[in-house]
Structures are given as C-alpha cells and as structure tokens.
C-alpha cells in the first residue's frame, strides 16, 4: 500500500512586541502552525523597566504576554501570571506576578534564554519563544532635526519626526547579536511575519540587531508585514501604509518585504476611546501606488476587530490569510504520513 502524503505544518516566525504580537500568535496556535515568536528586549517602561533597572534582567512584559498567548494552561492559571499588585503594595505596585517569575528564573538559570525555555515547558507553550537578544538593549532615536534620545519609553514623548532608530547593549559598546536559535528559525522558516505593533519601538528594535536583521533580509521565507490600523502618537503621525513599509526598507537598506497585509475596513471617528487608548491618533491612510513600488504583493481586506472601545487586528482573519499565503507560495512541501 502506498504511503499517503500529508501537508506539514507551516513554519512561521513572528517578530515584534507589544500587544499586537499575542493576537496573531493565538490565531497561529489555534491553527496548529509550527510557530516561533521572537520578542523585543528593548522595553524600559512600567514594570518591565523597573525590574530591568533593579534586577538587571531583560524586560519581561512582552515575553510574559507572548508565553501566555501560546500557553496551554487554563485561563485560571494564566490569570495568576497576569495579576498585578495594586498601589497599596508600595514597592510591588504595578508589577505582575509573571514579570517577577521571569526575573527570578533568569537569575536562577543565569540566562534569560534558558529561563524562558524552562518557563515555556512549565506553561505548556505550544511553539518556541525566544528573546531577540540574550541581554537588555537600549533603543536610540535620531529625529529629523538631528536631536537624539535614548530609551524606548522616552521616544514617543519627544513628539518629533523620527529619522532613524538603532540599538546598543545595556552594559557597554559590544556588538549585539541574536541567539543561534533565532537565526536558525528565521533561515528555516516558510514565512517570517513582522507585526502588528509599534513600528519604531516594537518591530525595528528587533531588526536593528545586526545579524537578526540580515537574516530577515537573506531568508528564503516569505516575509510578510502586517501594517498597523492606526497611526501612533510620537511615532507615525500622518503615516500612510506605504510610509510604514518605506521606513522598514530604509532601515535595512533593501526592499526585503514580499507581502503587506492592509486593513481597508473603515474605523468610525467616534468609536475609539482616545482617553483609554491615548497612543492612537487616526486610521492609517492608504497609498496603494506607493505600496506597489515597495513590495511585490499587497493584500487588502477587512482585518478589523472592534473591541473594548478600541480597534485591533482580527487574529483569526489574519492567520487565515497567512496560511493561504504559506501554501500558495509553494514553500510548504509534502511529507510522508
């Protein structure tokens, strides 16, 4: 009897940080993709920044959220990791239990990479979670007027047009490198997904790690950018979708993105609570002529999810499109059953 053939799971690497990454990862987990998440380590605000300063550990917040998005634990157990101490706890105020656990395990293991792998095993993570680098990074911004600032949490507050960002090591001026596992995942992927997330403070901090950025440029995988729905205060005022892509290409010195996903569903002006989501400005405008000059393929559709007075990418719709792309690009080979 002949062996039947089946299509293997697509190997998808998702690179970013912030709140956008978990939305896509949950969808990929539900579709049973072979997923690897590469998470930014340049955050220096909130609980992550405080622990980074006091305990000298890689910022934990984005890593925590990514681990939870791929975890098979019950929601009750996930809530424990997300619990934040209230303001009455003084020193612990604002810290989540998950961040404290990550900091403690990094100290115990002597390595943030090893700590994440152990925690992923404990949490039943379905996939791989890697920090973009195995050390905390400092994000620097150079603005159009030539002024500079360092620190991820400070960049948007300057409220000037950003010309360029780059990263340096927290301790000294040694060259920042990604781990071997990150580079192998990128080179072995069927698809590399960038975003969604803050352009200058969630996506580019990863790509500005020299060997990581070069791996994304060199990979034979389909490189997909998920364009943001809204512009962001202090980062992308007045940006069109093609402006987002142009910035990525200029930073890496090459047009490396193969496909851009763009939401075309209208966001009503009175829907978004701009007090609750104070980083939002207006919906990203479309420039399809500009996009066609930047990338070979643009996919525009309704990828919108209205929730809690805010607008988000619908993870299920986005992932359906990613899977269609993965199989249509002929990068998924047949494997024996």
Regions flagged by a language model, labelled:
Residues 135-200:
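Active-site gating loop/helix substructures
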Residues 32-33, 219-223, 257, 295-296:
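A short helix->loop->beta-strand "cap" motif at the edges of active sites that frequently abuts
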Residues 42-161, 321-322, 328:
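Electropositive, gly/pro-rich neighborhoods at or near active sites that engage anionic ligands
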Residues 206-213, 239-244:
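Charged helix-capping and loop-helix junction motifs
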Residues 238-337:
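C-terminal functional extensions of proteins
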Residues 20-25, 201-208:
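Short glycine/serine/threonine-rich phosphate/pyrophosphate-binding segments
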Residues 2-14, 29, 33-37, 124, ...:
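Non-transmembrane, aqueous-exposed alpha-helical and coiled segments at domain scale
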Residues 2-58:
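Gly/lys/ser-thr-rich phosphate-binding loops in alpha/beta enzymes
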């Amino acid at each position: 009897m002949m062996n039947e053939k089946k299509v293997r799971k697509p190997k998808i690497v998702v690179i970013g940080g912030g709140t956008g990454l978990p939305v896509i990862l949950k969808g990929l987990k539900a579709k049973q993709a072979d997923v690897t998440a590469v998470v930014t380590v340049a955050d220096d605000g909130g609980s992550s920044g405080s622990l980074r300063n006091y305990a000298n550990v890689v910022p934990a917040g984005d890593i925590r959220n990514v681990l939870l998005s791929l975890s098979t634990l019950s929601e009750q157990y996930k809530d424990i990791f997300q619990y934040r101490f209230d303001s009455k706890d003084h020193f612990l105020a604002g810290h989540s239990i998950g961040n404290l656990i990550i900091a403690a395990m990094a100290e115990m293991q002597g390595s943030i990479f090893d700590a994440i792998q152990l925690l992923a095993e404990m949490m039943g993570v379905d996939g791989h979670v890697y920090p973009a680098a195995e050390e905390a990074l400092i994000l620097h911004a150079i603005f159009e007027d030539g002024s500079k600032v360092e620190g991820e949490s400070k960049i948007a507050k300057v409220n000037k047009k950003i010309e360029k960002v780059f990263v340096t090591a927290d301790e000294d001026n040694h060259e920042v490198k990604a781990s071997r596992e990150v580079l192998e995942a990128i080179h072995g992927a069927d698809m590399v997904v960038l975003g969604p997330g803050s352009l200058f403070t969630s996506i580019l901090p990863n790509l500005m790690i020299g060997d990581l950025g070069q791996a994304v440029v060199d990979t034979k995988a389909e490189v997909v950018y998920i364009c943001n729905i809204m512009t962001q205060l202090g980062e992308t005022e007045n940006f069109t979708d093609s402006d987002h892509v142009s910035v990525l290409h200029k930073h890496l010195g090459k047009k490396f993105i193969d496909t851009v996903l763009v939401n075309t569903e209208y966001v009503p002006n009175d829907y978004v609570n701009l007090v609750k989501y104070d980083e939002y400005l207006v919906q990203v405008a479309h420039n399809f002529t500009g996009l066609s000059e930047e990338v070979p393929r643009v996919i525009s559709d309704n990828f919108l999810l209205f929730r809690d007075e805010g607008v988000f990418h619908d993870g299920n719709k986005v992932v359906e499109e990613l899977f269609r792309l993965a199989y249509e690009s002929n990068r998924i080979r047949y494997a024996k059953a």
